[in-house]
């Protein structure tokens, strides 16, 4: 247990390192959220045709901001029909899969790791072999048609996501059914960026009938797996505040792009990194009633709870970076500090995140605003990369090797879900995701890129 002075609020951190970031239609999908003046907004909502093609909504209950979003459900529907009926789209997807899997056999374990590993080979035939820890093997299925489209078809999951299905039959005989084993491979564009080339999940849906769900990031580049690919740039949301009186928060969004994290927390990335540093914006959820424990908590205490719950997602967003703008890697030791502001841009407090050489992850919230005067623009109070030190024999700052047992494996989590509901940021995110569901795309994640039209003098 780590103790800091009583003037500081301290909490424990579970530190998760993120893998590479890449374009992914299911995570951090950009939407242009533009605030306009009254005249431009009325030109939209007074247009009957546009109203029939879209919807009006408020970012959260009680908000005096009204937003319009055009509805493209018919375009999505037509795209899905084209995908399922297009031989060209099927050939394109099959070719992509074969380019990834061939020519060398691919051996992988499931996530989470199990007793079995799985080997997919693509030679004269495509085979899937199940291999046990002590070397026992079972042929789950094979196909000599993997270079054609005979054994493939597009399908849709229960959540509406398109995937490519391939069925392999004639595996070794099952001891229970006395029939050949068979396996279906589902090739899927992952919801979030992966920290490894492949992600495998396996289920035995019936005795000796298997389902392999293989997540391949490269599939996200194909429009067959992403019906909004190439069209999101044309899909904008416009908003207007009644009385043309804009909130001071909009000045923040003139200078920063904002990503909704969770629990009322925004990640603010400066549009001019030479002028502004990264910071967090926080809106504490209101208590549900006078009896709730939230009512008795300070803003700092409520932030700590919300921040801990959102920490995995924060690390996965690559928001915390080295002084040179590179992703944090295992072995990096640092103290990262950032201001936390409210919706009007007023400083609430500072948040410190430290990972030290004793494998201790420490978080601290304090109200010493003077620390901002000496804070580097890149937010790192200090930074030392053990990876660099270990390869530099002449370095005088080489750090001793330490156990990282308190730091979770960098490959521990690919997809992070949060059941929490509440707070302005979460409500805004929910509304935008509801809009996505209305246009037939239920699994999308939303990143809000704020653009404000400045008044002309």
Curated annotation (Swiss-Prot):
Keywords: Disulfide bond, Endoplasmic reticulum, Glycoprotein, Lectin, Membrane, Signal. The keyword Endoplasmic reticulum applies. Disulfide bonds join 174-208, 189-220. It is a peripheral membrane protein. Residues 1-22 form the signal peptide. Glycans are attached at residues 47, 71, 142, 147, 389. Belongs to the OS-9 family. Residues 104-222 form the MRH domain. InterPro entries: Man6P_isomerase_rcpt-bd_dom_sf, MRH_dom, OS-9-like, Yos9_DD. It is found in: Endoplasmic reticulum membrane. A mannooligosaccharide derivative binds at residues 116, 175, 181, 204, 210. One of its GO terms (molecular function) is carbohydrate binding. Its main location: endoplasmic reticulum. GO terms for cellular component: endoplasmic reticulum lumen; endoplasmic reticulum membrane. This is Protein OS-9 homolog. GO terms for biological process: endoplasmic reticulum unfolded protein response; retrograde protein transport, ER to cytosol. It comes from Kluyveromyces lactis (strain ATCC 8585 / CBS 2359 / DSM 70799 / NBRC 1267 / NRRL Y-1140 / WM37) (Yeast). Interacts with missfolded ER lumenal proteins. Lectin involved in the quality control of the secretory pathway. As a member of the endoplasmic reticulum-associated degradation lumenal (ERAD-L) surveillance system, targets misfolded endoplasmic reticulum lumenal glycoproteins for degradation.
